[in-house]
Amino acid sequence: PYTTLFRSALSGGNQQKVMLSRWIMTEADVFLLEEPTRGIDVGAKTEVYEAIGDCVKNQKGVVVVSSEEEEVLGICDRVIVMKNGCIAAILNAKAATTEEIKHYAV
């Protein structure tokens, strides 16, 4: 009961950070994050990005599913663009652009 009360008292951004922290504490080798920053403020997004970066530095695999092209380009090494349930392109995030992602996605 206390965890439900505590969690519900948090902002959306803090709820996201708590969930991410709980996952990291599991010491998993790979993390799958779907829209990890949806609905949270810029400050909380930065903290989530830092947590993702820490996972990568600690040799953890991180797969991010996101519709935010800028976000993906900023935190990922590779971008896999899906179209109609199939892989349309695999891009180097450091060289790719949002326009290129949209080109393959549409």
Language model features with spans:
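Conserved H-loop
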Residues: 60-65
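Helical segment within the ABC ATPase nucleotide-binding domain
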Residues: 46-58
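Short, small-residue-biased leader/transition segments that mark boundaries at the very start
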Residues: 1-5
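A short, proline-enriched helix->beta-strand linker immediately N-terminal to the Walker B motif
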Residues: 25-29, 35
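Short, glycine/charged-rich "phosphate-handling" switch motifs in NTP-dependent
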Residues: 78, 90
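ABC-family nucleotide-binding domains
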Residues: 34, 41
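A short, surface-exposed alpha-helical micro-motif characterized by mixed small hydrophobic
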Residues: 72-74
